[in-house]
Structure formats: C-alpha cells, structure tokens
UniProtKB/Swiss-Prot annotation:
EC number of this enzyme: 6.3.2.1
Protein name: Pantothenate synthetase
InterPro entries attached to this UniProt entry: Pantoate_ligase, Pantoate_ligase_C, Rossmann-like_a/b/a_fold
CDD domains per UniProt: PanC
Entry annotated with the keyword tRNA processing: no
Species of the source: Chlorobium chlorochromatii (strain CaD3)
Length: 290
C-alpha cells in the first residue's frame, strides 16, 4: 500500500491506473477506522481492480461547537487497518493541501440538504459536498462507496454527481452493527460504559417500528411517536428528530406503502454524544423482525 498526501501526485497515479485499463474505486473516510469502513473496502474490491481510501478530517463539514479538535486521529492504527483490508493507495492530505491559501470555491447544496441533519448542523452538507467533489476529481474513480448509515449524505452525493455530471457510480453499503445492534461509528468511543449500554435504544426504536409495520399499522406518525416515547424514556436521551422519509427526496411521509422504499431516521443526543441511525422500512422484506 502506498501513502500519498499530495493531491496532484494522487491525480497522476489515478490517471495512470485508468490508462492501464483498470477500474478504480474510492472509499472516503475521516479515519478512526472500524469494521464499517472495512466493509466499504470489501465492497469496493468487488467493483474495481484498484482501491483508494481517502483519510481526511474535513474541517469545512464541522459546524461551530462540534468536535473537530477532538475527533479521533489514530493515524498509524488507520494505516495498519487500511493495509490489512487490501487498500492499494491511502490518500491522506493535510488541510493545507486540500484548502491552500487563496481557496475560494465551494459547493452549495439545495433543498435536500436543508432538512434533518442539515437543519441541525449548519453548513455541514456544503462542506461534505465540497470535499467529496474535490476528492472525486483527485482520485478519478469509476465507483465510490459510501455507507448507508449517513443516508441523507448518500442521497446528497447521488444528487451532486447527477447535477454536476460527474462520471462516477455511487454505491451505497449496508450499515454494519455491533452484536447488540448499535451502528458502528467512530464517535462511539465518546460514549461512557453506561451510555454505551443505553445507546442500544436507537436500534430498539428501529426494530419497534419494523414490528409495528409487520403488525399492519399504517400510520407512520403514530409509529414515530411511539419510537420517540421509547427513546425519551431512556435516561440521558434527547431527540433531534425521528422521521419517516422518502429515500430519494428525504421528504417526510405519513402513511406506510410497502411498494416504496422509505427510511426511518433517528438523531439522538446521549449525554454529550450525538448518534444517528436509520433503517429501510419501505419494502416487504424490511418488515421482517430485527
């Protein structure tokens, strides 16, 4: 595995790989790698000959008061994990290399980015869209793999590449969970041992919703209210949002329809830690118990 920090050097490598007729896939991360990230690499390998992982804690996607300074950065550990996973190139630029002096241009997202996460994290998705656009131009992949845990981000990136005519296939990867259902996340390390136990209430809420749909309940507002009650009954939990949304538009929906794909989104604060999760609810298969 080669480690590259210079964007122009990475561009040259990617161009050379393409000239050899090989397929390229990219997995974008902020480091603090876990099994969820490794699953993205595994999926990337299925669609490509060469896999690039990007490792960059992007400052422009952190809102004021968020955890930019304390975000975990175990670089040597991440290098070992990436190499063990079979990554060919690890692109790990500095902030100065990605946003040099005089940098002025950014990507502004539309209505899709104004709801849910966008409403609670000012400027977040504009920062995501800007860095993803830059990384796609640097790595020149045929496919890019993103986790479904950040479902709204995935939808925005799909919109981004469609709107800007970026020639790349965006592939969504299933959420990887702990044995007790908690979605894998680099921020889980912030949880105390007691908070970690209580954090399973998010998965419990998702499973409750699936069970209610399986019973035949069609009123999604009612189910969302039940999930909210379940979560707020857990010590230390406050809710940013619980919402059923159309998977493509992220507009709220109120009535179940097994012919469509929709998701239940959760954003919950547990102590000082903010957790997000989601689950597909809009297919007959998704009604199966957790």
């Amino acid at each position: 595995m080669q480690i590259i920090s210079d964007p122009h050097a990475m561009q040259a490598i990617s161009e050379n790989v393409r000239l050899q007729g090989k397929r390229l896939a990219v997995v974008m991360t902020m480091g603090a790698l876990h099994e969820g990230h490794i699953s993205l690499v595994t999926l990337a390998r299925k669609s490509a000959d060469t896999v690039i992982m990007t490792l960059f804690v992007n400052p422009t996607q952190f809102s004021a008061g968020e955890d930019l300074e304390r975000y975990p950065r175990p670089f040597e550990q991440d290098v070992a994990h990436a190499e063990a996973a079979g990554v060919d190139y690890l692109f790990a630029p500095t902030s100065a290399e990605m946003y040099p002096a005089g940098h002025q241009t950014s990507v502004q997202c539309g209505a899709l980015a104004e709801r849910f996460e966008g409403a609670h994290r000012s400027g977040h998705f504009n920062g995501v869209a800007t860095v993803v656009t830059k990384l796609l131009h640097i790595t020149k992949p045929h496919t890019a793999i993103f986790g479904e845990k950040d479902a709204q981000q995935l939808a925005i990136i799909r919109q981004l590449v469609a709107d800007l005519l970026i020639d790349v296939e965006i592939i969504g990867a299933p959420i990887v969970r702990e044995a007790d259902g908690l979605a894998k996340s680099s921020r889980n390390i912030y949880l105390s041992s007691n908070e970690r136990k209580r954090a399973t209430v998010l998965y419990g809420g998702l499973c409750h919703a699936k069970a209610r749909l399986a019973e035949g309940e069609q009123n999604l507002k009612l189910i969302a209210t039940e999930v909210e009650a379940l979560i707020t009954a857990t010590e230390g939990c406050t809710i940013d949002y619980v919402a059923f949304v159309d998977e493509a538009t992220f507009l709220p929906i109120e009535q179940a329809d097994a012919s469509k794909r929709y998701r239940l989104l959760l954003a919950v604060r547990l102590g000082s830690v903010r957790l997000i999760d989601n689950m597909v609810m809009g297919t007959k298969d998704s009604y199966k118990p957790c």
